[in-house]
Regions:
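Mobile beta-alpha loop/short-helix "lid" or hinge segments that flank ligand
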Residues: 51-62, 117, 151-171
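Glycine-rich NAD(P)-binding loop of Rossmann-like domains
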Residues: 119-122, 170-176
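Short beta-strand segments enriched in small/hydrophobic residues
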Residues: 17-25, 125-129, 173
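Short glycine/proline-enriched loop/turn "hinge" motifs that connect secondary-structure elements
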Residues: 12-14, 118-120, 154
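Short, glycine-/small-residue-rich phosphate/pyrophosphate-handling segment
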Residues: 121-164, 179
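N-terminal beta1-alpha1-beta2 submodule of the flavodoxin-like/Rossmannoid cofactor-binding fold
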Residues: 1-114, 179-189, 200-226
């Protein structure tokens, strides 16, 4: 009798992950732009296709509903909407201004939130910051996280804040501290793993529930019915 090897179901090939990546700083060589460039290198070395953008591409006038009604959506917010719709996930490296996010970033989010389909909903996001301070711009990330999650974005739990960023980069553009560099790479890798899993397994999508004060029983019922 010939032994027949057991049938093995082949594992699905890794899904291509497309990531929109930009720095919310308007300065060409700001600390956050340098951190975003490093993130780009890590993501492309892994398995992601990176759509690199600059904040100036998405800039627009201060949100005004009269302007929206009279002339529609400005080119910058429409471009951000288009690029978000074309990606599986987004990564934003943002400076902290007075314990909050930059006003121009919030303005872009406010504009884009008015365009349908609303592109942040159910889209994965990772938030990064770099600052000369010991807090690394972390308070700015929390202020950014709130409106994104309100709009339904699946913001990755582990945000990355680079403290004393003016001394953190080596000559090659990487992080001089090897342990910190390892943590940064692992953070981005874990984020990609989650986005990739969400593309393969529908059950991952059911795990993301935004309660927003909703009674627990109703939220559970909504997940089970999904």
């Amino acid at each position: 009798m010939t032994d027949t090897p057991p049938m093995v179901t082949p594992m699905p090939k890794p899904a291509e992950v497309r990531v929109l990546l930009f720095s919310a700083s308007l300065r060409t060589d700001s600390l956050n732009t340098r951190l975003a460039r490093l993130a780009r290198s890590v993501l492309e070395t892994a398995r992601a296709t990176v759509d690199w953008a600059t904040m100036s591409e998405f800039d627009g006038p201060s949100y005004n509903q009269d302007l929206e009604t009279g002339s529609g959506f400005p080119p910058g917010p429409r471009e951000l909407h288009r690029r978000l719709e074309a990606c599986d996930a987004f990564v934003i490296a943002t400076p902290e201004y007075n314990a909050s996010m930059p006003g121009h970033l919030k303005n872009a989010i406010d504009w884009v939130s008015r365009i349908r389909p609303q592109p942040f909903n159910a889209r994965h996001g990772l938030l990064l910051s770099a600052s000369p301070s010991m807090a690394g711009g972390n308070r700015g990330l929390w202020s950014l996280r709130m409106p994104l999650e309100h709009l339904g974005a699946r913001v990755f739990p582990d945000m990355f804040s680079l403290a004393q960023a003016h001394k953190a980069f080596g000559e090659n553009g990487g992080l001089a501290d090897s342990l910190l560099a390892k943590r940064f790479e692992e953070n981005l890798g874990a984020f990609l793993d989650l986005v990739e899993a969400a593309k393969h397994y529908p059950c991952i999508k059911k795990a993301w529930v935004e309660f927003l004060g909703e009674p627990g029983g109703e939220a559970v019922g909504r997940v089970e019915a999904a």
